[in-house]
Amino acid sequence: MTQSIIALDIGSKTIGLAYSSGVIASSLDTIRFEEYNFDQGLRQLESYLKKYNPTIIVVGYPKNMNNTIGERAEMVDYVIEMFLDMYKNFNKDQIIRIDERRTTKIAKNILIQANLTREKQKKYKDSLAAQLILELYLESRKL
């Protein structure tokens, strides 16, 4: 059975998006919004939710390197609550948090090694990070 899964890499000004039907993760896009205007960012997410009709939303959860919950993870929790308030057809059981430590750094390194310009690196960094988060989730299901 195929599943429709969307991954989110939530930042203060962007949401990186990736998609999978349950096998291969693909980066989709990056939603950009005014800093900390998560309402604006989440409203832009609606067209992707309609198009891909996901049953699971995988969210990168940025724990601190010592495995504690810091400001960034609290910000993600806040955005998840906003998401659930805005999109009533989803429930908290459909939201899966994946430890995303270092995924943005790995995404940056991949883009640097691909010899992309700084402008293109900035354009693709967040959606690639979302793809890496989604790949971590897909791998965890195989264990």
From Swiss-Prot:
InterPro entries: RNaseH-like_sf, YqgF, YqgF/RNaseH-like_dom, YqgF/RNaseH-like_dom_sf. It is an enzyme of class 3 (hydrolase). Its main location: cytoplasm. One of its GO terms (molecular function) is nuclease activity. It is found in: Cytoplasm. GO terms for biological process: rRNA 5'-end processing. One of its GO terms (cellular component) is cytosol. The keyword NADP does not apply. Coiled coil: none annotated. Keywords: Cytoplasm, Hydrolase, Nuclease, Ribosome biogenesis. Its EC number is 3.1.-.-. Could be a nuclease involved in processing of the 5'-end of pre-16S rRNA. HAMAP family: Nuclease_YqgF. Belongs to the YqgF nuclease family. This is Putative pre-16S rRNA nuclease. The lineage of its organism: Bacteria, Bacillati, Mycoplasmatota, Mollicutes, Mycoplasmataceae.
